[in-house]
Amino acid sequence: MATALHTSDLSGMEVLDLSTYAEFSRRHHRSRDVVREIEALQRLAHVFATDPPKILQELVSISMALCGADSAGISLEESTPTGQTQFRWIATDGAYSPYLGAVLPSLFSPCGTCLSSSAPQLFRVSKLYLDTIGVDAPPVTDGLLIPWQVDQTRGTIWVIAHVACQLFDQEDYRILRSLADFAAIAVRHSAQQEELTQQTAANAALAMANELAHRINNPLQSLMNTVFLASQGGTDAADFARQAVDDTVKLSALVKELLHLRKSY
């Protein structure tokens, strides 16, 4: 039988590898509504096709509903500017809904253990653990963690109970494993859309910069001509000087606009 990587008595966190934890397979299996599962997957496919930004939220909602969980979520692994690794909850539902966007450390965490082993985990965390990491949330009495990865991006999808100690079974694992694949696809799609948006914005900025360059050329040429004429002296020199000031103001405004554009992109 597998042993916990961290005992709940000392740390408040208990994580068990499902591939070696035989007791999980002996848990009582709840009856399932196959039609409900099919309808949920159809709804998921529909959201992905018609409203992609909502796919991650739909994923956790379906995970929670099909597994009978109290909370569900998707964690994304991130790197901080200092090179540290952390997890951001990019989708949450149930009792953990208020913690959308929460950032947790990767060291000494169920998600970190899950990704380090690249294997599904059963986990529990007590109030002691949550207090240690500074999170004011209900403890986890039973939880399933499934890793997912696409290219270099990875994370976990999870369902948790806050009261029952043996809520999840092999069928829940099967369902969550399938949904983990959807999570990976959804995250990759989101990244591709963001990249496309950035590229579109960059192209728009380039076009605007080219337009500004042409607009700058006119007052610049006028300024050069006016300065030349003013330098010749004569009765019109004062008028040419005033015109040079006006051209300089126009040129300065366009340059500021161009500089602002560069800062924005």
Feature-to-residue mapping (PLM):
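A short, aliphatic-rich beta-strand micro-motif
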Residues: 141-150
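GAF sensory/regulatory domain recognition
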Residues: 61-64, 73-102
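Conserved HAMP-HisKA connector
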Residues: 40, 192-215
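Signal-transmission linkers at sensory-effector interfaces
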Residues: 2-54, 205
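Allosteric cytosolic regulatory segments
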Residues: 177-184
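Acidic/proline- and glycine-rich, intrinsically disordered low-complexity segments
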Residues: 85, 95-123, 128-129
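Short beta-strand-to-loop transition segments that serve as allosteric relay/switch motifs
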Residues: 95, 155-167
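Conserved DHp (HisKA) dimerization/phosphotransfer helix of two-component histidine kinases, i.e.
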Residues: 66, 238-265
